[in-house]
Amino acid sequence: MARQGVIASMHALALLLGAFAAIPTGVQSIGVCYGVNGDNLPPASDVVQLYQSNGINLLRIYFPDANPLNALSGTSIGLIMDVPNTDLASLASDPSAAAAWVQSNVQASRRSACRYIAVGNEVSGGDTGSILPAMQNLNAALANAGLGGSIKVSTAVQSDVTQGFPPSQGTFSQGYMAPSRQYLQSTGAPLLSNVYPYFSYVGNPAQIDLKYALFTSPGTVVQDGSNAYQNLFDALVDTFVSALEENAGAGNVPVVVSESGWPSAGGDAATAANAQTYNQNLINHVGQGTPKRPGPIETYIFAMFNEDQKTGAESERHFGLFNPDKSPVYPINFS
């Protein structure tokens, strides 16, 4: 989920001052995260209809919630389903717990099109030691259920697991990421990356140009060898790519942007106009890819609704594309 604190690491500070070029169309894979931290949200069946009516073909949920899973049954909407951070230790230590999790949450809802299982979201501290064994146990459970390879198992991380500038110098700053990236390479799973130019900007507005964060600057900001960076999103994604490529055995791991967004109220630069600009430009841009990884980037916007019960900074409650009554917070076009 979107974070309360600023996660702009030093490499993001340096991706500054700047400019940007025309944004192409042609997005193939745009999704939206579906959070439920609200007391006034519509029923899941209405939510799935809202996805379908807007042409949104990918969805992320943060725990195996039976209501959206049932509503998704029989649709073609692709799904990321999270394992809550609180469940990691048991899944890491007990293969039978992983088997039970798969049976209850994947096999029981097999008519929903689950693409990825995210083993934790932005896990920190000592819990990071549970990520790899939990992924291993879940993959084994999927294989035993006859689902090996059809559902990829990964984990969702934020930008502060990387460091380095320019993007070509990106490395992982957290020790648990080295074995994780090699495991992802061995299974063919992507790294799920939460990418927020918003947090980088609000943490360093004197050094990072708002236009660079919003995809609206007129020229190159960072020249990194032959790669020209015209927006902060590309620079942050390619820092992940470089960190994966640092190990020759993990250079082919795909990057899926599992969260990105901009709040419409409640914080610095959090306006409906900026949120509309960022999210519409993101939709239009990700079909192009980044300088290091041309081609469509599967990307999930955070979030579907403004959620009045989210904790933390006021802006956390204003990342939604839609109000709880299903009216748009601002116009957005997914086509």
Swiss-Prot record:
Induction: By pathogen infection. Residues 1-29 form the signal peptide. GO terms for molecular function: glucan endo-1,3-beta-D-glucosidase activity. SUPFAM superfamilies: (Trans)glycosidases. Its EC number is 3.2.1.39. InterPro entries: Glyco_hydro_17, Glyco_hydro_17_plant, Glycoside_hydrolase_SF. Disulfide bonds: none annotated. It holds the Pfam family Glyco_hydro_17. This is Glucan endo-1,3-beta-glucosidase, acidic isoform. The lineage of its organism: Eukaryota, Viridiplantae, Streptophyta, Embryophyta, Tracheophyta.
